[in-house]
């Protein structure tokens, strides 16, 4: 946000943001930059979107600082799943609907052994997928193969909380095509489960 950056106009700025599919600084280089700047006697602020310890690589950076003997503090943020859910009017939990919510990264291919999509499908709990837009068709296929009904309500929220926010609601089996037709791009989150149906019930009473 340029307005936030402007508050520190006299500071030295290092842009290390990441976007899927675009060239970016590797995480080890970011870790070392933090250590080097702190070692040079500078007060360093690592500004992140969302919560640094939830798919934000904050743990990697904190560990690098710890190993280098650099003291630090962590300020909590609002993770994208919470912010996007509220902005898209999709309650992540609802009495009588679910008692848990799964947060998972879709950055790797759906066939990656690091994520057991069949187990997630069998859990019966709704989920929010971070960084999964590029692999959405693979993820949907893996969840369906794991037993999740292709008719399961599914939504994609792009640029949630921002002026260009766009929300697409479909089903698990059709969401990849719906997202492509709508022209959604990163950053986007995917919501899967009956919680998505609550959006249609709540929207009519939403204040402008």
Residue ranges and their predicted role:
Residues 12-18, 69-73, 92-102, 147-156:
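Short hydrophobic/aromatic-enriched beta-strand-loop microsegments
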């Amino acid at each position: 946000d340029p307005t936030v950056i402007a508050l520190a106009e006299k500071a030295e700025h290092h842009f290390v943001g990441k976007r899927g599919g675009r060239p970016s600084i590797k995480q080890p280089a970011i870790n070392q930059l933090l250590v080097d700047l702190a070692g040079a006697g500078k007060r360093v602020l690592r500004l992140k979107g969302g919560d640094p310890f939830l798919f934000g690589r904050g743990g990697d950076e904190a560990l690098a600082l710890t190993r280098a003997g650099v003291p630090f503090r962590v300020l909590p943020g609002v993770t994208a799943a919470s912010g996007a859910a509220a902005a898209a009017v999709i309650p992540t939990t609802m009495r009588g609907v679910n008692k848990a919510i799964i947060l998972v990264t879709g950055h790797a291919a759906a066939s990656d052994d690091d994520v057991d999509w069949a187990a997630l499908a069998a859990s019966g709990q709704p989920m929010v997928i971070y960084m999964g837009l590029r692999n959405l068709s693979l993820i949907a296929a893996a969840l369906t193969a794991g037993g999740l009904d292709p008719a399961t309500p599914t939504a994609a929220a792009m640029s949630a909380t921002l002026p260009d926010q766009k929300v697409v609601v479909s089903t698990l089996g059709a969401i990849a095509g719906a997202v492509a037709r709508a022209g959604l791009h990163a950053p986007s989150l995917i919501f899967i489960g009956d919680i998505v149906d609550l959006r249609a019930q709540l929207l009519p009473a939403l204040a402008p």
